[in-house]
């Protein structure tokens, strides 16, 4: 079996759970007892503590603020582990999630391990945006793509009252669940109005900013960016020909914002204003706002 795999697809399709289950299968060996709980030969790299203060809180078992990216120190610590033998059997698995949020130095460091993987070591790179990985990393891994889910399947999981969530989930069960948990339907309705008719008076933009709230969490911002992109993607089919280029440009700008949001120190108020402006411009607004 190849040593490096990219698990690619939208957020909310079950890639993380699949990676954990696949890792269990990879490290299991006949006649070698396996631990029931956390496995010492399955290593998960994700967002670590933001700073020393957060690291102390994490060590004490307290809530802590996470970094916005996966850093080179985490990759180097993992590589130190690779210099030792696995604890239980002869194989180990490294899961990196989300791999597209590795800092550039971290990606370069990981590349060395992918080029010369230790015997019995497998890498599972979970990504919502495979294009965000270095081409050299992509070339050394095989890609397993997770397809979108159909509406009927999502509805079976979510039950009654989920139609609006399903319509804007873009085939992602996780996105539909977040839509319902975060009560995003009022936001979705304003976004659809902005994309359809613009906002020459700024009233809809003000309404959207009010619906989102003054201090949205990082997770809420990411869901709102996803929702804005889906809104534009769905609007282009019915848009007049003279508006389609504007929708495409606005969608590209939202994709760029979504890629930067986890690692850039954006002011949330300004970011929400920019999202509102991009939607309004796609709908034909004449004057953008930038906070």
What are the roles of these predicted feature ranges?
Residues 98-102, 114, 130:
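Conserved Walker B
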Residues 95-97, 110, 122-127:
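Structural recognition of the conserved hydrophobic beta-strand(s) that form the central parallel beta-sheet
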Residues 83, 108-122:
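Conserved catalytic/switch belt of AAA+ P-loop NTPases
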Residues 1-105:
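Clamp-loader machinery-focused feature within the broader ASCE/P-loop NTPase space
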Residues 1-34, 119-122, 127-291:
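Charged, glycine-rich active-site and insertion segments that engage polyanionic ligands
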Residues 80, 112, 139:
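Conserved adenine-binding aromatic site and its adjacent loop/helix in ATP-hydrolyzing domains
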